[in-house]
């Protein structure tokens, strides 16, 4: 059964090497990134696993959306760039899965055009993302989000 605690993510009140697994969804880009990674390493057992999904700051459409929607942002928000991805590599053995290049804009269009989200446009966008990720790996950095799966070094 999970237990929930409210505390400073930069100074967790858990013992060293306490957790087997640490999960986060769109949280790291709101924190002092290196301090947060250090704290995750501290509370994670050797060989412990991480799973994070975070926005990428490299995507030009994402940059435009952030510029056009400042009311939906917080001052501490810093989507991940190459530097942050390399900081992860220093502490964890990771695999990265990139998602949402075409699926975001075409998903929005799909929501306007169709009542049912399971339609040809949504499927096309999803399959385009999968294909581009496989066939043109350098494009992965232009995707909107990254899913990071890793093990503590």
Named regions from a protein language model:
Residues 1-15:
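Conserved SAM-binding strand-loop segment of SAM-dependent methyltransferases
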Residues 23:
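A conserved beta-strand element that flanks and buttresses the S-adenosyl-L-methionine
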Residues 26-30:
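A short His-aromatic
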Residues 35-49:
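A short glycine-rich, Lys/Arg-flanked "PGG" loop and its adjoining helix->strand segment in the class I
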Residues 49-76:
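Conserved class I S-adenosyl-L-methionine
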Residues 77-98:
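Short alpha-helix
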Residues 98-153:
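A C-terminal cap/extension of S-adenosyl-L-methionine-dependent methyltransferases
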């Amino acid at each position: 059964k999970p237990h929930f605690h409210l505390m400073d993510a930069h100074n967790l009140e858990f013992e060293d090497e306490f957790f087997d697994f640490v999960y986060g969804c769109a949280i790291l880009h709101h924190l002092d990134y290196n301090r947060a990674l250090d704290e995750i390493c501290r509370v994670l057992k050797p060989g412990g696993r991480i799973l994070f999904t975070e926005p990428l700051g490299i995507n030009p459409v994402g940059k435009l959306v952030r510029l056009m929607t400042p009311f939906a942002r917080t001052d501490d928000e810093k989507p991940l760039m190459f530097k942050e991805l390399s900081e992860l590599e220093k502490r964890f053995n990771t695999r990265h899965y990139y998602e949402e290049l075409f699926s975001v804009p075409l998903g929005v269009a799909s929501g306007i055009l169709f009542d049912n989200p399971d339609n040809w446009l949504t499927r096309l966008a999803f399959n385009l993302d999968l294909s581009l990720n496989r066939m043109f790996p350098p494009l992965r950095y232009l995707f909107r989000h990254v899913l990071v799966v890793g093990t503590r070094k």
